[in-house]
Amino acid sequence: MCANNKPSMTWAWMPLLAICVVVTCALCTGCSAKTASSSSTSKAPEKARPEDNPAVMLPVNTYELAGSVGVDGRQGVCCEGDYYWVSGSTTLTKYDRNWNMVAQNLKPFDGYTIEVNHIGDIDVWQNELYVSAEYFMDGVGKNIQIAVYDGNTLQLKRTFPFEPASGQLECSGIAVDADAGAVWMCSWVGEESGRYLYRYNLKTGAYEGKVHMQMPPQWLQGIACYDGCLYMTADDGAADDNEPDHLYRTSIKPGATSCTVTLERTFDDVTRQGEIEGLTFDKSAGKLLVLYNRGARIVLGMPKGFYDGYDREISEVFSYSITKHR
């Protein structure tokens, strides 16, 4: 017996309830069919949360080690046409496709109006080298410069004015995004400076703002633009513990103030763990090129002695064949 002691009223309503159930189920079935039909012809909307979107949170490429070559320079690498360029802390060197040296500048700081002593990662566009230069000592940078060099003579052509109000305290890498008309810079120094990417106008050199990285990598060393994304190398593995360094990826939408960073590749296949530096993409060959140093102990970003078995630092460019996932 029902708790309300009114069984006659409950049974009286059953036929009407049955009709309602049948009608309701018919309507629901019709909606489901319509929804299924619509979804089969329309593209699913992009998920707003990065963690729900595999296209954002997973690597977009596979990178297979193809080889390595020793180079004269421990900082950065770039590629255009038939040539490669490598930066040392105080040198610029040009190579042909077979890694034969073509030209070298051992005094790249001639022509600066303020004191600089360090070159970081580099990039090239229309045979002009874009160089991140500064005065760097024991983990502290100052006198940051965006410098442009001739790709043939390796001589300084011009510099862009740096914007101190940006909050950038160091310049470890630089990348040209020609499609967006932008030059991007990254900072090796952590805390607030290392959490942002800094944008300048490619034509005028004017500062255009900064983008906050969500899940920012630690100790950024290089940055490069490829296939609509920005890729960054980070010296975030402890060489003393044989920990590998990493490649990260992000995509910045027009007008965005922040971007999500994704782990793209772990470099556990280099000759020996040391210090990762700059990177570039050889688009004609479909390869990623990464500069790696080994042998020297690095303290606050500077070589301080050597590991057992080494009496000098060895700089190598590792090449990786790229296969797109989608």
List the model feature ranges, each with a label.
Residues S89, E134-F136, S187-G190, D235-A238, ...:
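Short loop/turn segments immediately following the C-termini of beta-strands
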Residues M101-F136:
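Blade-loop segments of beta-propeller domains
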Residues V71-C78, T113-D123, A165-V176, M215-A224, ...:
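Repeated scaffold domains used in trafficking and secretory/extracellular systems
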